[in-house]
């Protein structure tokens, strides 16, 4: 009986601990040999409503979203130097977003200033939910290209 009540208590605790409306999602990060790559995805509606100043800045650097664009993909390229995090901006970044339902979209991401350093970003069409494959193509000045893949579940 005690085992059953403990199990029930744990399940209820987990159910109430879940947050359905997390505003800022934790970015996903991949560690490469030379640097780290982090992505974050936020819907355009959330940006307009909660962060109008940030939306205006993104609109200035990325242009106005097209008719079917629903989300903003942000990419940060960074590395740790001692205790400091240094954001790297001397790259060109392209993103390819694929889903089982929508056709693949590949776009060059625009550089824009962020609170801690330069980020890269662009507008994309994503559905309300689903699993997305996001491929990033990062090129440096010498022509070397890194491909980084993220599987992203939009809920």
Where are these regions (language model features)?
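Sec-dependent signal peptide recognition
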Residues: 1-8
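Hydrophobic h-region of N-terminal signal peptides that target proteins for export
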Residues: 9-17
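Short beta-strand edge segments in extracellular beta-sheet folds
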Residues: 151-155
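Short flexible loop/turn segments that cap and initiate beta-strands
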Residues: 84-98, 102-106
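Beta-strand-rich domain onsets/edges
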Residues: 18-72, 78
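Short acidic/polar inter-strand loop motif in beta-rich domains
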Residues: 140-147
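Short, solvent-exposed, Trp/other aromatic-anchored flexible loops in extracytoplasmic proteins
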Residues: 105-137
